[in-house]
Amino acid sequence: MKNLIFLISSLLLVFSCVPVENNETSTINDGQLSGKLNDQADETKMTRELMKAYAENNFRSIEYMISDDVECFFNSDQFDKEGWLSGVSSHFDLFDNISNNKNQPINLTTANYNNGTVWSMAWFEWTGTGKFSKDEVSILVHHGFRWEDGKIVEAYHFFDPTALNNEISLAN
């Protein structure tokens, strides 16, 4: 009897450890948001150029990359093209030594999705010194640009605005 219980227990243990094949979860979905990443795409190179122009306080030099009817968001605040151009230029009224890559390289790539959209995405650490607070500021940033015909038609910037808002309040 002991041998029978041992045999049944052993079989249950062995078969309970065998993975169950589940085609729904093991199938790779080749859906709309699947696609290919390319860190050497033209859009990646243009985004690098844009980020360099920003850090050099020469953002208007890349104005040609931005669609006239761009939808631009800084967190949940929406801006038009001129709002974006003048807004980022105002950073230099508030901060010195602005950099996108002082402490670490920029992570940047472009995704060509199966639904036909093209997005460049960057993750980086923005740094600067407050002109009013004198604080050394470091902000983690993610931005994504959707491209059509060589122009940015959507732009999303995500970051914690606390240090920026603090510097604005000290400037006033």
Regions found by a protein language model. Name each.
Residues L4-V14:
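Sec-dependent N-terminal signal peptides
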Residues C17-E56, Y64:
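Short, low-complexity N-terminal intrinsically disordered segments enriched in polar/charged residues
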Residues S26, V153-N172:
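Low-complexity, intrinsically disordered terminal/linker segments enriched in charged
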Residues G35, F132-V137, A163-L170:
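A short acidic/glycine-rich loop-to-helix N-cap element
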Residues N58-N112, V118:
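A solvent-exposed, acidic/Ser-Thr-rich amphipathic alpha-helical stretch
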Residues A111-V118, R146-V153:
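A short, structured loop/turn motif at beta-sheet edges
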Residues W123-I152:
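Exposed beta-sheet edge and beta->alpha loop/turn motif
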